[in-house]
Amino acid sequence: MAGAKEIKTKIASVQSTQKITKAMEMVATSKMRKTQDRMAASRPYSETIRNVISHVSKASIGYKHPFLVECEVKKIGILVISTDRGMCGGLNVNLFKTTLNQIKNWKEQNISTDLGLIGSKGISFFRSFGFNIKGQLSGLGDTPALEELIGVANTMFDAYRNGEIDAVYIAYNKFVNTMSQKPVVQQLVPLPESKDDHLNERQQTWDYLYEPEPKALLDSLLVRYLESQIYQAVVDNLASEQAARMVAMKAATDNAGNLINDLRLVYNKARQASITNELNEIVAGAAAI
């Protein structure tokens, strides 16, 4: 059994680690709430643009934006959004597994893939597999700006416009709640039909006068919508990261508390054994006299 002094040193070390994990848990909780606010604020903007796009695309007879035209799919581009930092449980691992499974399914259909990567964890992971990476970005921080994301996104959209790829998807962790984050791979372009499109057809029987013409408006709205979708995915992933880190750090703090209790028990036993030995030596010495 280790000596009492050595055990006491271990207890102090674990207590120091516990303070760090507790602080990280509190920081993650605060950041998660702020990110949730940004997530909630940006969602109505994205949903409204989507509804307007649906209406304008139907009004613009004879014109189909490239982002609305479906074709035979032979190559797909995927924007993968991961974290820059670790200590967030299996968040990135689950996302990478989901993405790789989707890529495998496409490969079985003779569909190849190009990647655009956001987040240092995804960059290091997918580079090791030898994928064709068209663009990458890391170091976004806790308050990402849309201007930083546009570069990687435009790499994919330009490839789509030029016919190098036939569809663009985005993979990220969708924030469900504090205890649940779901890895998803969803289509960006060609723009999939929204569930609300048919509902809008039934509810809106009127038309609008467009300035400028519907074509120019549709071109602008589609770009804004796709940018908002990418921003929303990044913010969703950030909220998921902070939630996962909060849960992981809470578990680490609780485990540290349990370990401290176990070490204190061992320390008390070692101290008791030491006192018993000293008493035995005193009794033996007295008996010898």
UniProtKB/Swiss-Prot annotation:
Cross-referenced CDD domains: F1-ATPase_gamma
The entry's keywords: ATP synthesis, Cell inner membrane, Cell membrane, CF(1), Hydrogen ion transport, Ion transport, Membrane, Transport
GO MF: ATP binding; proton-transporting ATP synthase activity, rotational mechanism
SUPFAM superfamilies on file: ATP synthase (F1-ATPase), gamma subunit
Membrane topology term: Peripheral membrane protein
Cellular-component GO terms for this entry: plasma membrane; proton-transporting ATP synthase complex
Predominant cellular place of this UniProt entry's protein: membrane
Location(s), subcellular: Cell inner membrane
Biological process according to GO: proton motive force-driven plasma membrane ATP synthesis
Pfam families the record matches: ATP-synt
Keyword Mitochondrion: no
Family in the record: Belongs to the ATPase gamma chain family.
Assembly, per entry: F-type ATPases have 2 components, CF(1) - the catalytic core - and CF(0) - the membrane proton channel. CF(1) has five subunits: alpha(3), beta(3), gamma(1), delta(1), epsilon(1). CF(0) has three main subunits: a, b and c.
The protein's role, per its UniProt record: Produces ATP from ADP in the presence of a proton gradient across the membrane. The gamma chain is believed to be important in regulating ATPase activity and the flow of protons through the CF(0) complex.
Name the record gives this protein: ATP synthase gamma chain
Annotated source species: Haemophilus influenzae (strain 86-028NP)
Gene that encodes it: atpG
